[in-house]
């Protein structure tokens, strides 16, 4: 999930303090505050082009909007036990929201339309974040002392495969032309075209990955004071900020 998405005819952006803004162009002075709830914590956004879904750290855990202006809370089923819906992605069966499963919570949330949500048992405990979809499979990262990369064609319980484990933490990730690209805290990257077979590229980045996204035909990775650009997730070119 992102903190800024292009939805229909406008940008929608979220903040750590529970605010949601929209803008037709993204330029300074064009942003309008649409929602403000400081108690909700961090927001993450995903859109399928029809409806925008927002997940958050407090109840109600899911909000939806067709236009970015009016936001409607959606019910997470009783017994879900969700303490935090950490992130969300739009993909094959609809929307997949990952959760903080470090304690009693042992569910993902899956929805075909963003409105009705169904619990799906996770394959392991842990902090599940950065769900991704490449057009064929979901990939979700399980963080902690090590990174576990789990893959599923549907997001349904019982369909997840542990595809890769590493002592390196891979918190930043994106999808570029169907390829999964993960950035590590040690300047390495991981790439995969199918979500199951992963290739390690040691020292591919000029520093640790602080943020990563895809824009057009390139992936962009932010570092402290610089950023780097790649067309394949393997070879990166560093540039100064500003």
Locate predicted features.
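Short loop/turn motifs that cap or connect beta-strands within the blades
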Residues: 33-39, 74-79, 120-124, 162-167, ...
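Entry beta-strands of beta-propeller and related beta-repeat scaffolds
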Residues: 9-13, 50-54, 92-97, 136-140, ...
């Amino acid at each position: 999930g992102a903190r800024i998405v292009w939805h229909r005819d406008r940008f929608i952006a979220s903040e750590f303090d529970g605010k949601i803004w929209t803008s037709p162009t993204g330029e300074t002075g064009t942003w309008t505050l649409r929602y403000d709830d400081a108690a909700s914590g961090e927001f993450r956004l995903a859109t399928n082009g029809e409806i925008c879904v927002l997940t958050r750290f407090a109840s109600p855990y899911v909000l939806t909007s067709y236009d970015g202006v009016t936001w409607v809370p959606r019910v997470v089923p009783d017994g879900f036990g969700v303490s935090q819906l950490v992130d969300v992605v739009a993909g094959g069966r609809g929307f997949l929201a990952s959760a903080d499963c470090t304690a009693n919570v042992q569910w993902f949330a899956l929805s075909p339309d963003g409105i009705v949500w169904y619990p799906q048992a996770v394959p392991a405990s842990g902090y599940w974040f950065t769900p991704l979809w490449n057009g064929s499979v979901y990939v979700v990262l399980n963080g902690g002392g090590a990174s576990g990369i789990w893959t599923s064609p549907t997001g349904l319980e019982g369909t997840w495969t542990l595809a890769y484990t590493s002592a390196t933490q891979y918190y930043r990730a994106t999808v570029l032309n169907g390829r999964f690209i993960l950035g590590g805290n040690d300047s390495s990257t991981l790439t995969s075209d199918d979500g199951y077979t992963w290739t390690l590229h040691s020292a591919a980045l000029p520093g640790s990955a602080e943020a990563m996204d895809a824009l057009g035909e390139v992936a962009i990775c932010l570092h402290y004071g610089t950023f780097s650009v790649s067309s394949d997730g393997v070879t990166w070119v560093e540039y100064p900020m500003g």
